[in-house]
Amino acid sequence: MAQSAEQIVVTGGWPLNGTVRVPAAKNSVLPLLAAALLCQRPVRLRGVPRLSDVECSLALLRGAGCTAQWQGSDVALSGSPVQSTLPGQTAAQMRASILFCAPLLARLGRAETVLPGGCRIGSRPIDLHLTGLARMGVQELDAGPGRLVLLAPSGLHGAEITLRFPSVGATETLLLAAACARGRTVLRGAAREPEVADLADFLNRCGGSVEGAGSSTLIIEGRRALGGCVFSPLPDRIFASTLACAAAAAGGRVELTGCSPELYAPVLEILAQMGCRVERGGESVQVARFGRLYGAGRVFTGVYPALATDAAPPLAAAMLCAEGESSIEDVIFERRFACAEGFAALGGRVNTAGRVLHIRPGGALRGTRLSAPDLRGGAALVLAALAAQGRSQIGGVAYLDRGYADFTEILASLGARIYRETKTA
């Protein structure tokens, strides 16, 4: 029996022009959905993008016994968890499923899940999560390969915890655990990312007590219970970065509204150095490229406020179109540049050495068949295809659906020759 799958078809060589409003950040929405498990009153999240990872999170909430439903572009959440075992098939699909364990431990004293999935971009251990939870009274049972069973037999209690690396996921997990733990938790070495501050803001709006968000030290006074609220998540700085890089790669002028340029300033600064015209104004940015792009030299990712690791592949796609040499090193994940194989298939002169992607000028990009290796690498291949001459077909669309809502429609509205189709194998 024939199997069908979607692919993205791009005819490159067309500039982008127009305005796009930046949607809510996936990396903010997912921990907010997990945080709703702590709330004893209804929660409404406004303007949530319809992503497959969001749908997985809603399925996890329903599996725990909560009500989670779409109301237009909002998500309405209510009810208390009654089931401590997360649906295995759903939990395995995304890394953020680990975030749901901390609220279940706080509410039910137990959490069971499969080890979380997500993009294969390198080692993504959860040892920092588990070490911190152990300091708060959590025990890990031997549940066999691929499973995680956590118990808090005496409930969660506050603790002083120092992270050896400012992991966003570990910071969010421990913040969620501490919000309803007994006593005070002091978390040092915490991630400073805006999405962490957004989670802290949400918890405070629901009656929690979190101080120091945006700094490397968080002080959380545990509450017996949290209420609810109506909350608008932070705009998506990675989506904005991707569209800014699309304008650089394809040429033209794109205005991005509803997202502070400070959230993705490193990307904008690098694009400006490469020859793009970048005009900032309040909550909007215009990125224009009508002439040549120049090499960026060597750039590095890092923890916030440095260049975000998730923005590295789209930025690399823009570098493919430059006349000078560029290299980009990701210090977070060792397999961040799996998209390099696709870049080479398009004609790019690229090579990888460890965590570094080297890009040399002179490669004439021509359309070809490609497959997205992961979420951000897939977006990078779409951007490179926009700059290539001829037709490209990009498989692995499910990766893109995890983090970009209506991606092809948005690019088409800007003038790209792009659409999705179902292919039959």
Report the location of each language-model feature:
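Short, structured segments at the rim of ligand-binding sites
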Residues: 1-425
